[in-house]
């Protein structure tokens, strides 16, 4: 997994945290030295596990993060390839998997979310994003989604998706 023991001490069976308190502290410290930074307009982007993490920012820290773009996120580690998830979540699958699932926690979403996914993603099954979409609808949470037909993992790198992400952040963070 090529990560330090300190990283694993925080994130072991806890991908929902993934160091958010530290990241928020760093952003606040940077803003203290750079008054041009507006902490009322913080966005986050991530792809794959970073997509899971970007959405989690709005679930666990929606009081800080205002908008997120999640590209091809593995939103529930119970439906992803187990060899990858075991590195971070352990085996066997237990209650901690459900607690860390964006799908089971979607009702806690605060802020503006854009989900991007590729129709032909062979790394993270698109059903992971569909599961989150279903949970968001059931929780009556607003969100945007962009499907890139014919695209695989990393659909957000498509030129059309790049423009849509920029538009999303401009709309959501500039008002």
Enumerate the language-model features and the residues they cover.
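Cap/lid segment of the alpha/beta-hydrolase catalytic domain
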Residues: 1-47, 53, 75, 80-83
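C-terminal catalytic histidine-bearing segment of alpha/beta-hydrolase fold enzymes
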Residues: 2, 130, 137-175
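Short beta-strand immediately N-terminal to the catalytic nucleophile in serine-hydrolase-like folds
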Residues: 44-46, 71, 116
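Residue-level signal for short, function-critical loop segments
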Residues: 48, 119, 151
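Short glycine-enriched nucleophile-adjacent loop
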Residues: 51-63
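Short beta-strand/loop motif that positions the catalytic acidic residue
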Residues: 109, 115-117, 121
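Acidic catalytic loop of the alpha/beta-hydrolase fold
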Residues: 120-124, 154-155
């Amino acid at each position: 997994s090529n990560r330090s023991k300190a990283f694993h001490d925080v994130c072991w069976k806890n991908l929902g945290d993934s160091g958010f308190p530290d990241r928020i502290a760093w952003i606040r410290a940077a803003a203290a030295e750079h008054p041009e930074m507006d902490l009322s307009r913080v966005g986050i982007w991530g792809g794959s596990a970073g997509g899971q993490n970007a959405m989690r920012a709005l679930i666990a820290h929606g009081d800080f993060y205002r908008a997120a773009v999640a590209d091809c996120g593995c939103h529930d580690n119970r439906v992803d390839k187990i060899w990858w998830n075991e590195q971070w979540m352990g085996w066997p699958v237990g209650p901690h998997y459900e607690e860390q699932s964006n799908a089971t926690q979607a009702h806690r979403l605060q802020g503006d979310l854009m989900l991007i996914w590729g129709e032909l993603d062979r790394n993270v099954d698109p059903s992971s994003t569909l599961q989150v979409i279903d949970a968001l609808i059931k929780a009556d949470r607003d969100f945007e989604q962009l499907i890139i037909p014919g695209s695989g993992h990393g659909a957000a790198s498509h030129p059309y998706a790049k423009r849509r992400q920029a538009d999303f952040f401009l709309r959501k963070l500039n008002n």
